[in-house]
Amino acid sequence: MIYTSKKIIIFLFTIMQLAILASCMDSGYRLSFPEIDDLADEYPAQAKVFLSRADSNDNKGYYKLLTAKIEYQLKGYIYKENDIDDAINIFVNEKDEPLLARSLYYKGASILNNYRDTAKAIKWFAKAIAYDSNMREKEKLDMYNILCRITHQNIYTVELEDEARQ
């Protein structure tokens, strides 16, 4: 009886240790970069968590693009512009036009939001437009909305200047 109860206690203790050990381990569930990319469109905070679990060496350019995209979506600006610059260089070398177009868009958006330099931003958007047939629809629409907003602001500014001259 005592021998059996010791076996039961040891067995239960072993099961508890395994449960605790399993709960402390990483789940191991990782999303691929395209899945994280899709998730970032609607839920950038959750995408950031999955991106932190991803191996940045799998596809450095895509990883850096997603880092910049998620940061831009969460904060409205890109703090580390060297990530997007690295992504652009990688995609130019790999001749990956869809990801290059998206990287150029985020570079232009970053310049516009960080420095309010409309002329430089438009130059980057113009480079992205050269590849826009390969861009994702959401980013293409966002880019054209930004360009329309810039155009509208410029027209409004010209109208105000004309009124001021009169």
Listing of model-derived features with the role each one plays in the protein:
Residues 24-166:
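A "functional boundary" signal
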Residues 2-12:
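Bacterial N-terminal signal peptides that target proteins for export
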Residues 11-20:
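Bacterial N-terminal signal peptides
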